[in-house]
Amino acid sequence: MSGNRKIVIDFKKILPFAVSILLFVVLFIRMFSYKEHISDYIGLSSSIISSKLLTFIVLLGIWLEYTAVLIVVLRPFFEIKTIKNSTKYITPFIFVANLFLLKPSVLLLTGQDNTLLTVLLIIEEALGLVISIYYYVKEFKTEEINYKSILVSLGIFGAMMLASMPVYFPQFVFGLTKLQMIPKSLTPAHRILLYGNILFPVALYFLLRNKSQGVINCALIYISLATLIGYLLPYNYQTFSEPWTWPFHLCNTAMFIIPICLVFKMKRLFYFTYFINVLGA
């Protein structure tokens, strides 16, 4: 038996994972590359784009982009029907549509033309399309098209969008409301917020309790990454030079630690974070 063993690297198998990780890195660089202006708008009529319809379409495209990117990023790591169908039949259309909406998207996000953001968005759309087309071609001959399964995946995709909704979307579309939340008074708006936070994890438990471990892992990783992206949207490159704005609060650090624990299966760190946050609360 020879003492020298050759390590054979199958680049065809590694490539989807490498492109997926690269896409995620590009997304984060893109998010921090500009000072966002989009959260300043209140109602569609306040948009820098003259057409309300185009403003809404672009705003929806930006929202769909976050959902689509996270789905194709997770695709190489999970063989789940919804993720597979979404990657092949839904995300390609989103990436192509956002290429056509590139200029108004940049204008809405920053309030002006931004060459760096434009280039990063093009790279992001291209990488997303590469992954989507790769899996469509790869599975074209081996898997039959099941229209019922695609419709179910489309419905689940809609539910997945809730986790990736940008925080500025309701304000931009509907404007400000007359409802007020007084911290020490259980107003209707305050009750909805409290009950929603209590019911969501309970509902999620019952939805996932009979699913495979792969589905559970995928769902939790997706939710944690989507909410992390939503949390990071107001930040930009200047944040790194302003330590007083860094997320050192326990609840804020948990936004970063939970995805790390789920992705790398770090149970001890998870329970330590859980204990510290409960103690802090």
Give a label for each model feature.
Residues 1-9:
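Short, Lys/Arg-rich, polar N-terminal cytosolic tail immediately upstream
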Residues 12-20, 79-93, 146-152, 212-225, ...:
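Membrane-interfacial loop-to-transmembrane alpha-helix junctions, especially the N-terminal start
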Residues 22-38, 160-171:
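Alpha-helical transmembrane segments of multi-pass membrane proteins
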Residues 60-73, 121-138, 191-205, 252-264:
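Hydrophobic cores of alpha-helical transmembrane segments in multi-pass inner/ER membrane proteins
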Residues 65, 105-176:
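Extreme N-terminal leader/anchor segments
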Residues 213-259:
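A glycine-rich, hydrophobic loop/mini-helix early in the fold
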